[in-house]
């Protein structure tokens, strides 16, 4: 993994961490308001982010974010989530998501709202980039993001892709992989289940600035993050 800069200022780190969590959650809440695509899965996500804190940052979640279908097919749609036109001068960050209809429909009985989660479960050390996401963490994320997708419920539930992506982005920022304004492409390659251990590693290809999340047991690729 290429480390291009390092920040040891804990106050700055906490500010950026908090900012990113809130910002991504705002995008994801906006996506959850899109109707008629329950059970569809994320194929790719393109993010345009500014990692530097801004004046009036706590106002961000009050910015009107609108999901707009920009390309539609029978089995896939592309959705853009960005600030309303009148807010774009102040807020130019955004996200595009490719949603894919699964080959088989998922029918899961509705469940009541679930309790608040504990902190992220991380096994291993910061050095080996090991992560594991508990079921309680998944349940809290679903509540906060207003995510009612049935594929994330029940005994056979898979983790929300954005939950996994968010944790990876925070870890990569701490390691100095991203700075300033950044455009990223995230590809969701395989589903991940609660408590399954994964780790971050680079692509292993010279000149390719990409990071992969792989399962510890089988080395299966779960997602890739590439700087555009």
Regions found by a protein language model. Name each.
Residues 1-60, 152:
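Hydrophobic, proline/glycine-rich low-complexity stretches
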Residues 1-22, 98-159, 173:
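Catalytic strand-loop segment that frames the active site of acyl-thioester-processing enzymes
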Residues 8-11, 30, 54, 63, ...:
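Generic signature of intrinsically disordered, low-complexity segments enriched in small/polar residues
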Residues 24-29, 40-44, 58-60, 109-111, ...:
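A short linear-motif detector with a strong N-terminal bias
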Residues 29-37, 118-119, 169-174:
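Intrinsically disordered, low-complexity boundary segments flanking structured domains
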Residues 37, 88, 123, 131, ...:
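Homeobox/homeodomain signature
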Residues 39-127, 192-194, 199-228:
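HotDog/MaoC-like acyl-thioester-processing domains
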């Amino acid at each position: 993994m290429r480390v291009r800069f390092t920040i040891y200022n804990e106050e700055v780190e906490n500010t950026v961490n908090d900012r990113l969590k809130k910002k991504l959650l705002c995008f994801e809440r906006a996506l959850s308001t899109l109707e008629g695509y329950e059970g569809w899965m994320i194929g790719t996500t393109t993010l345009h982010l500014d990692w530097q804190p801004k004046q009036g940052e706590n106002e961000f979640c009050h910015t009107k974010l609108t999901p707009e279908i920009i390309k539609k097919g029978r089995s896939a749609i592309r959705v853009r989530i960005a600030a309303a036109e009148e807010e774009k001068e102040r807020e130019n960050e955004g996200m595009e998501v490719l949603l894919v209809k699964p080959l088989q429909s998922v029918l899961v009985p509705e469940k009541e709202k679930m309790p608040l989660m504990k902190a992220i479960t991380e096994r291993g050390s910061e050095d080996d980039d090991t992560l594991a996401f508990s079921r309680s963490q998944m349940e809290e994320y679903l509540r906060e993001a207003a995510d009612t997708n049935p594929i994330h419920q029940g005994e056979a539930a898979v983790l929300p892709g954005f939950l996994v992506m968010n944790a990876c982005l925070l870890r990569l920022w701490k390691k100095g992989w991203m700075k300033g304004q950044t455009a990223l492409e995230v590809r969701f390659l395989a589903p991940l289940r609660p408590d399954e251990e994964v780790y971050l590693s680079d692509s292993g290809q010279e000149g390719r600035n990409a990071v992969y999340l792989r399962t510890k047991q089988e080395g299966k690729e779960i997602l890739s993050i590439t700087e555009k």
